[in-house]
Amino acid sequence: MYAIIPQQIPQGMRAEVNEKILFAIDSGKDLIPAESIYNCYTGIGGLHNLKQSDFASYHEYAEAKKEFEMGQFFTPHEICRDMVDMLCPVSSEMVLDMCCGMGNFFNHLPNPHNAYGFDIDGKAVSVARYLYPEAHIEKCDIQLYN
């Protein structure tokens, strides 16, 4: 389990930090400690650089933002921990996160071999697979899954 270490990554640097993390993962070398990846990867949510003032209405802005972000929102680490603690899964139970992103919930499960996850964002799936190699994580749209 990775420790939760609060990070203050400025909005303007998040895309760069994410790209460095993805490069490190793709390289196959341990360039960045897994715990740092867990605490620093932010995904695409909030990285759109769109300004509401550039749109005729809030609705148009929200639609453009939604299209860019694919609805991505990573549940904060503390909330994931608290939710898993409340559920108290036992190690023999299988757990499915149908929109797992980078796998924040998996960090708190008693048995990573019984963790299953889907996500449509290939970058987030790469991070999740790196952080939780024992989990079963697929890049797919759950609406199309058979």
Show which residues each predicted segment covers.
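Class I S-adenosyl-L-methionine-dependent methyltransferase catalytic core
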Residues: 1-146
